[in-house]
Amino acid sequence: MNNKERSIKMKKWILIVLLFTGCSADHQAQEAVVQTQVKVDFSKMHFGCDGNSITAGNQWSKTVVDILGFATHHNVAVGSAKWACYIDTQEYGSKDFVGISGGWKSTDDKVEIQKRHNNVAKVHIQKFISEVENGSFPVPDIFVFSMGTNDTKIGRASDALKEKILDKVDLTTMAGGARWCIQTIIERFPECRVFLCTPIQSGSVSHNDLNLKKIAVLREICNAFSVPVIDCYSECGIKAEDEV
């Protein structure tokens, strides 16, 4: 193997192994990512993402951006975030919008509670689009969703997908929120490649069982939009049996 072949192989390996928290993708996603790496200069590409505490700030996504050399890093993730909206979730940028909070400790503060109810994927995506439209960030070439572990109301993928009008989808379920966000990014940025990272395992067997149900629903939503799924649950190296 010559140096050029080693270089190409290493780039492929970086994409598959290091891209998206070092977790492996479905075969379809791996093939697509490998093909992209060989042809594309990442220094001319822009990376966007949304998620919860695992993604918020400069964590795995910043590592991906730095290693692969993306031009920009646009991250709207917030700790404690969910896919599902609340019945009183506000529209980002609306007249009465009070902001977003990743707080999780008990509180009676009504404004703080409203901010927490705004900490959902739909509002994050509205914020992301607004920041692109106002010139704060460029149009993304890659966008990764990585959330779901905090959702409790899963819903059914079939219910979320059967509604033809996007704004009529029930966004108070994880399934509905995921469909709205994925479809919105795809339609707003048609040249952007979208990926979804599944929730990872934890030290709780019951929580892991619930996550598997969520993953099945998210996978069905992604299949409907031809969005590759990154299997972080199976490949993250974390298992309940290893927790002490």
Task: Name each region found by the language model.
Residues 146-153, 179-215:
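Active-site segments of SGNH/GDSL-like serine hydrolases
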Residues 43-49, 54-168, 172:
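Conserved SGNH/GDSL esterase-like catalytic core that processes O-acyl groups on lipids
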Residues 199-244:
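Catalytic His-Asp segment of secreted/periplasmic serine-dependent ester chemistry enzymes
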Residues 27-31:
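Boundary at the C-terminal end of the N-terminal hydrophobic targeting segment
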Residues 1-9:
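Short, Lys/Arg-enriched N-terminal segments with co-localized hydrophobic residues
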